[in-house]
Amino acid sequence: MIYEKIRDKIISMFPDMYKKINITLSERDKKSGKKPDIRNTEETIEYLLANECSMSRLGDGEFILIFGGRENYQKYDKELVKKLVEILHSNLSNHIVCISDVFGNLAERNDENKKYWKEHLRVYRHKYYKYIDMNKTYYNTSATRVYKLLENKSLAKPRFEKWRLLWENKDIVFIEGKETRMGIGNDLFSNARSIRRIIGPAENAFDYWKELLIEAKKIEKTALFILALGPTATVLSYELSKEGYRALDLGHIDLEYEWYLKQNSNIVIPGKYTNEVSGGNMVEECNDNVYKNEIIYSIYKEMKNDCNKIKDKYSITSI
């Protein structure tokens, strides 16, 4: 914690110099010609269809945390960073690790996303290379970003169709944020045999990752876990795979499907936490009885129970 405070203080005092150093180091690594080994989107989906394995994703948000930064919906946490680095270097036979395929060809991405990554890597490429294992085969985070980032939107439909094969006639368990509500209002998961939900916080979910893991381990191992909980999903998918479960960290895939159906990726999806769109954190309550009946555990209920216990402990009863 002291190191981070000192580092942040130095950066705040000399931001231009800090950025210039990062750019110089990143240019050096770009000129070296070395790149991580990352399978493309099609190969990633096909691998998951052919192999009964779990998947964790580390996108720019997870790497920003590793670099010592913070995300809007996840505060910096040393234990989380340690876990993310462990996952990045892991080599489990029943688990794959996805990172962003952005270190070479950006052909599939739209102009806005290309611009973002070119500027981002101009500063941070050398930091990515510091942590990425150049001898490891990674898979592609873009496999779950099926619509928004694509230049050619016609690729979305066949990819969604392939994804749906993974949970066809399966008993699935979502581990998601309070306002994620995967599959509500659309048919993305309508071909699943059953749906259950474990609900975590919309923000700073890693504070409760152990509690969520305990609940998940009560589920039968024939179930398929699908996770959408930011960096906490990255960790939980990895931990569940070590316990013999199949767990897929699919992140924004439900929002991607909503945007695909509406042919517009710059809109808030009513009733769902939409962190990439302005105003997307203002979410109304969900009164859908099907959704409510699918919830088998909610961290909010446990937090409320704990508060009530504390109140009971310190309450003064009159004689």
PLM regions: where:
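Residues at the C-termini of beta-strands that transition into short coil/loop
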Residues: 101, 199, 251
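A mid-sequence, solvent-exposed acidic-amphipathic segment
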Residues: 179-186, 190-222
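Electropositive, gly/pro-rich neighborhoods at or near active sites that engage anionic ligands
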Residues: 6-189, 315-319
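Residues at the starts of beta-strands that form the adenosine-phosphate
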Residues: 171, 194, 246
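C-terminal functional extensions of proteins
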Residues: 235-319
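Small/polar loops that bind or transfer phosphate-bearing groups
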Residues: 176, 228-229
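Structural motif
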Residues: 171, 223-224
